[in-house]
Structure formats: C-alpha cells, structure tokens
Design a protein with these regions (language model features):
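Outer-membrane beta-barrel domain signature
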Residues: 77, 93-99, 144-148, 170-176, ...
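Outer-membrane beta-barrel architecture
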Residues: 107-109, 156-160, 184-186, 216-218, ...
Length: 329
C-alpha cells in the first residue's frame, strides 16, 4: 500500500544579538511573494486537505529548482522562476486474468531565471522508457491500460533548452545515473478552419540504445465546437533493436465544458518481427472531470482488448478497467 506524506518546508533565520551587538535586518520579501503566501494560507484554511498537499508538492519542487538555479547566477528565483506543467497522479488499472497495477507518476517543468528563461529544469517519476523515447501521453502504457514494467518506472531529472518554439533539447539522468539526451522538432499545419496535422520527430541517445528516434503524427478534425476526431500514430526504432515499435489511436472526443471530457478510442500496437500484424487491439471508453476545483481531476476508463504477443499464441480477449486522480500544481 502506497502512502503519501506531505513534505513541509520551513525557512527562516532567527538572529539574537548580545549587548551592544549590531542587528542586521533580513531583506524584506517582495510584495508578490507576500501576496502569494497570504493567498496560499487563505486557501489552506478553506481547504484543509487537498490544498495543503498541493502547496507541499509545489513548494518542494520550487525548493529543488531554487538550488539548481543558484548554480548559474545570483538572480533571485522569484524574478521569473515558475513551475509549469506540474502533475502528480495516482492510477489503478487491471486487465482480466492479470493482477491489479497501482502507479504513482510525478512530472514538473520549472523555468530558471538565471538561464535567461531559455532553459528549464525537468524532474519527475514516470515510465523512464517512455520519457527517454518521448512517447505521446495519449499512447502511454497507462492510457492503453497496459500493466507498467516496474523496471522502467524510475526518477529522472535534467535540463531542457528551448532554442525555438519548434526545437527543444533535453539532457538528463534516469534510473539513478543513467544518462540520456534527446532533441525534439515539432510543427503543426492548419488545413483549414476545422482540420490540423501535428508532426513531432525526436532523436534520442542512451548508452544501451545508442541512437534512436520516435516519430509521431496526428490528424484532427473539429466536427463541431465540442466534438473532435483524432488519429494519432507513433513509431520508435533504435540502433540496438533495429525493429519498429508502433502504436495508433483513432478516437472521438466530446467536451461538455469545465474540463469534462468523454472519449471513445480504437487502439492498436505492434512490434516489427513479432509475426503478427498487431500485438494488441482494443476499444476504450474514458470519462474525465474535475473532482475538486479545477486542478484535481478524476478519470475512469473501461476497455476490451484482444492481445496476441506472437504468432505462436492465439489471440485472446480481456476486459480492462482503470481509475485515476491527477493533481495539477
């Protein structure tokens, strides 16, 4: 059973002067910091459960980022430093005839003012294989209701550099001190008022894979202001494996406003050389909505799948169920 302990960060200096000693006052905090602390305290009083947990996660992330940012200069973190895309999620999934799988994921990106807002710190705990190869979130094992590989779930951290809106570089470590690097190019082409194509190419390096690449492309059509159809495909190959691993999703996404989303997806995935056209095929229904304010979201997934890992195994069938909570910070 996984337990979460809130991490409190207490900072302050207490100076006690002797008789005749000079007393040096600490620098006054910036007005923006005072307002932020006051607002956070008010939120914590109004919500004594979820808001303190969210503040603890965010404060811990900022504390780590301040330390890294101080390596590059004396500019205060409050002068442009901020957490973006912070997420902490707990997800439980199970497939028929398999043991349930509980996973905890954490991801955050923090902009560093001492690097002129061109670089950011990224850190988290996730499927390191998907992180290194830059798999689209919608095609992750979790979102396809596939059991996690515990050996691939690990902490990671590093620095990212945004050279251009379309070009980013990352260098970091995962699973202890295993280095990796990747470069991502992305571009979007509007094909009219209702259609759009998104392309993403990522080149990555690890000591085990050597050079590899992940290509992802999606086509979206806005059927109406609340209904979108999307076809998403991704494929990964490395110098070590020399075989494509691919996945695809064709789905309809109906928005009901206020972050309420209903989706129906047809999913398939495969591996070159497996002897079968697709190693996993399935249909999946998903509902997502806020459960507390606009930053704590819940989701429920139900799917039916037909896996076949290789040509020697008959295609079987299995129901799958997943439920999760995601906190944005």
């Amino acid at each position: 059973m996984i337990q979460f302990w809130q991490v409190g960060l207490i900072s302050g200096m207490l100076a006690v002067s002797g008789s005749g000693a000079a007393v040096h006052a600490a620098p006054a905090p910036a007005p923006a910091e005072v307002a932020a602390v006051a607002a956070a305290a008010a939120d914590a009083r109004a919500d004594p459960v979820f808001e303190p947990a969210r503040q603890s996660v965010r404060s811990t992330t900022e504390w780590l980022a301040r330390g890294v940012d101080s390596w590059f200069g004396d500019k205060p973190f409050s002068d442009g430093g901020k957490v973006s895309d912070g997420r902490l999620s707990v997800f439980l999934l199970t497939r028929q005839h398999e043991t349930p799988d509980l996973s905890v994921r954490f991801n955050a990106r923090v902009w560093l003012p001492n690097l002129q807002d061109r670089a950011y710190l990224f850190l988290g705990r996730d499927d390191s294989r998907e992180t290194v190869t830059d798999q689209p979130d919608a095609l992750s094992r979790q979102q396809r209701l596939l059991k996690e590989n515990n050996a691939d779930t690990s902490f990671f951290a590093g620095l990212g550099f945004a050279l251009h809106d379309a070009l980013q570089f990352r260098i970091g470590f995962h699973g202890g001190l295993k280095p990796y690097a990747h470069a991502r190019y992305s571009h979007a082409w509007p094909l009219g008022a209702a259609d759009r194509v998104d392309f993403r190419e990522t080149l990555f390096w690890t000591p085990d894979d050597h050079i590899g690449s992940t290509t992802a492309m999606s086509y979206e059509h806005a059927w109406s202001s609340t209904l979108v159809l999307r076809w998403l495909n991704a494929a990964t190959i490395t110098q070590d494996s020399k075989k494509f691993e691919w996945s695809s999703s064709l789905g309809a996404y109906q928005s009901y406003g206020q972050q309420q989303l209903l989706s129906l997806e047809a999913l398939c995935s495969g591996l070159q050389g497996s002897g079968v056209p697709a190693t996993d095929i399935g249909l999946q229904l998903k509902w997502e909505q806020p459960v507390h304010k606009d930053w704590l979201l819940g989701e429920i997934l139900v799917g039916h799948f037909w896996p076949r890992p290789d040509a020697l195994t008959a295609r079987s069938r299995a129901w799958a169920l997943g439920a999760g909570i995601k906190m944005k910070f």
